[in-house]
Structures are given as structure tokens and as C-alpha cells.
Amino acid sequence: MKFLPQRHAIASFGEGGFRFGDMSHQGHLLVLPSGMRAWDGIDFSGFIAEKDEIDFVVIGTGASLKRMGLGTLEAQGLYADVMTTSAAVHSFNLMLGEARRVAAGFLAVGA
């Protein structure tokens, strides 16, 4: 997936990918106000480019909680809630359903 110019709730995840909006994506996923795209799991420039449209950042670190270097985001005034991908997907879907200005980065689970 290069770019999907909409945000969708995540319908399911696992086996190394995500399902949303009658589509699927294999690999890590970045969800920004402008849309959804593949993510390498370490580049936070997409969040920074759209920071004026983001109130909440959720990062899913895979099947287990991992530390991530978020200094780049924090230097731009963005603070991320880091949790497992399962918890992050649930949090993202809830906030998206409430029409909150949320962005997310999800590391894939179970390749």
C-alpha cells in the first residue's frame, strides 16, 4: 500500500498485517489525518509534518511493550502513548469513533 487518503478503523490485525476499509496491508502501518500508509516503524516525520492536525499519538509496539525513542516527537510538542499493538488498535479505534484528532503508528504482530 502506498497511500490511502482516508483514515479507517482497524477491523483486525495479526499474521503480519492489518485489515481496514475492505482492504488489507502487510507490515507496519502509519495512520495520519491525511490517510494511511506503510511505515518502517522508526521514522516519525509523518507525525511531525501533520502535527497541527494531531492531538493524540498512539504507538503500538507489536505483541509486547517495547521502548521507543520518542525524543523527535517530543521536541515537536507531540507526546505519544506507547502500548502493545492490540491496546493501541483498540485505543485508536475508540478515539477515531469519537472524532478525535488521533494519529497512530502500529508495528505488525505475528509475521
Across the structure, where does each feature detected by a protein language model lie?
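Mid-chain, well-packed structural core segment of small domains
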Residues: K51-T85
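C-terminal structural segments of small proteins and small subunits
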Residues: Y79-L107
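Non-catalytic interface/targeting segments
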Residues: M1-S45, G97-A111
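Short active-site-adjacent helix-start/loop capping segments
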Residues: A38-D40, L65-G69, H90-S91
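Short glycine-/small-residue-rich flexible loop motifs, especially phosphate/cofactor-binding loops
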Residues: E15, L70-T72, F92
